[in-house]
Amino acid sequence: MNNQGRSILAWAALFIFVILLFNVFQSDGLLGVRNNITFSDFLTRVDEKTINSVKIQGRVIEGTANDGSTFSTYSPDYPDLVNRLTSNDVNIEVVPLETRMNTFLGFLISWFPMLLLIGVWVFFMRQMHGGGKAMGFGKSKARLLSDKGPKITFKDVAGIDEAKEELTEIVDFLRDPSKFQKLGGKIPKGCLLIGPPGTGKTLLAKAIAGEANVPFFSISGSDFVEMFVGVGASRVRDMFEQGKRNAPCIIFIDEIDAVGRHRGIGMGGGNDEREQTLNQMLVEMDGFEANEGVVIIAATNRPDVLDRALLRPGRFDRQIAVANPDINGREQILKVHLKKIKYNSTVLARIIARGTPGFSGAELANLVNEAALIAARLGKKEVDMHDMEEAKDKVLMGVVRRSIAMSEKEKRLTAYHEGGHALVGLYCPAASPIHKATIIPRGNALGMVQRLPETDEYSQNREQMESSIAVYMAGRVAEEIIFGRNKVTSGASSDIKGATNIARAMVTKAGLSDLIGPIFHGSNSDDMYGRQSSNEISEATAELIDAEVKRIITQGYEFAKDILTKHIDQLHTLANALIEYETLSGQQIKNLLSGRALDSEEENKFPFNDSHTIKIDKENLHEKVKSTKDKKENIIS
């Protein structure tokens, strides 16, 4: 049993003992009173001369009958009582009121409720603050990592070799500082791990704890600030005091943006609780008092909101980017996680890594776990490649919703919609390859076409972005061609949103609009209130941007319409196949449209000799520029 359990049992036993003690002292036996009678009954017994003696204390009368039994009663203001007792030969003993009960016992009984409340309050205060002092609000919540249990080391971290190298140097410094001090080097005071969610920042911190033979404290950024003023600053001071007592040591602060946001005019004024906490942290990290041997490692996925004073050298000397892994990194991560499950020889980490571009380490771990769950659900003894593919589809496209009963009309419309996406994607060489097309409802969609790039992409050119817009618009175009303009549904709303986002990014951020030019009109980083702020642009420029976005989307729409109109027979073939099979892989779609067997594994490159390329209508563009100039003079010089 842990210390907290023993403490609760001890307090419970003490509470029960005091209650029992109180009841015993209140019981009749301890006070010599066994039978309460009415005053009228008492007078009757006196007159019948059945009472031997009485003891009077104030208005309380306790007596003994001739047969040895005891009794008690309460006397009203009755002046003739003594005369009546003496006339009936009753022995009378008068006891002073203040000596009836032991002084300490009386004090205990009278103050028992108050003492009980104080005891309960002290108990809960100790439990809330880890068994420390009753007023332990300002105590740090940093937890010292226990040596018990399995350790995570750098061998368990894969796919982020650069970050591991930077942090390995810090671990080596803590193990053998003289190696670096010989050359005059100083240990870094802090390292900030920056990266999107799921890339392994916290896992790296756990690996450092497993590698470094020094005390390792961990705390969350949200653990500092509470409702009481001054608590956060006090906890920061106490945390660094803990670090000094255990130096050399490492303190890991997860999600530091919860306390390290840049200072400004907040809701509580410029001196609010969070800012006091941040100010104290700045002083402790690099103030007048040195904290030699205390290394701060923090993690965040929002470096843009952190205060600049926190990021300067001397506080966080190193900022280590932890990005999503490339194909080699994904393969290494998959191998680490595959060690934890049973799988057969069909599972190839390289193939899975190639089909999961953009996946973070956490997503890859989830994919492997989902595959194991799928295999267990099917009663298999080992995970095979089919389970991995099914898990990938579940992660990418969502859970299959077989409970939705689609009518034949809806199924046919969905088949043409998804067939339009797939067909235009095949005829756009710059578009990402088709991974799978399905009309089985998954997630929030009735059907979808999943595209995956063959390699990791870190940027996109104009042709790729315009091809993506055309693929987005192809579903709506297919509905319009097959069912007519009045039968177009709202199912393309998410496609329109995706196309609009790409087109607006081309115009406002990437400088890919000939009309607007290479000028940035996107949003800046968050302001002091945490809101997105944007550059100051005129109303006329905003209209130009909207016109360019519309032109790019319309261009993609017309391009998709041209492809689908020209290859209408293939659209019918693909839609009918989707209605029959419900799900087709990218290779099956190519086989289908090339006249091969659907499940042929023969290498089959779809004939791109008839592929289309988006061409900008220069004449139309110049006409738009001219008309805009006529409408808004002096906008573009």
UniProtKB/Swiss-Prot annotation:
SMART domains for this protein = AAA (SM00382)
Task: Locate the transmembrane regions by residue number.
Answer: 7-27, 104-124
Which sites bind Zn(2+)?
H417, H421, D495
| Assigned EC number | 3.4.24.-
Task: Tell me the enzyme class.
Answer: hydrolase
| Names of the cofactor(s) | Zn(2+)
Enumerate the residues binding ATP: G195, P196, P197, G198, T199, G200, K201, T202
A Gene Ontology biological process annotation?
Answer: protein catabolic process
Keywords, sorted A to Z: ATP-binding, Cell inner membrane, Cell membrane, Hydrolase, Membrane, Metal-binding, Metalloprotease, Nucleotide-binding, Protease, Transmembrane, Transmembrane helix, Zinc
Q: What residue ranges lie in the Cytoplasmic compartment?
A: 1-6, 125-637
GO terms under cellular component: plasma membrane
- Pfam family membership, one: AAA_lid_3
Cofactor: bound how, per the entry note? Answer: Binds 1 zinc ion per subunit.
Q: How does this chain sit within the bilayer?
A: Multi-pass membrane protein
A Gene Ontology molecular-function term? ATP binding
Catalytic residues (positions): E418
Protein task: Acts as a processive, ATP-dependent zinc metallopeptidase for both cytoplasmic and membrane proteins. Plays a role in the quality control of integral membrane proteins.
* Subunit composition and interactions: Homohexamer.
Q: What is stated as this protein's family in its record? A: In the central section; belongs to the AAA ATPase family. In the C-terminal section; belongs to the peptidase M41 family.
| Protein name, UniProt field | ATP-dependent zinc metalloprotease FtsH
Provide the species name.
Rickettsia prowazekii (strain Madrid E)
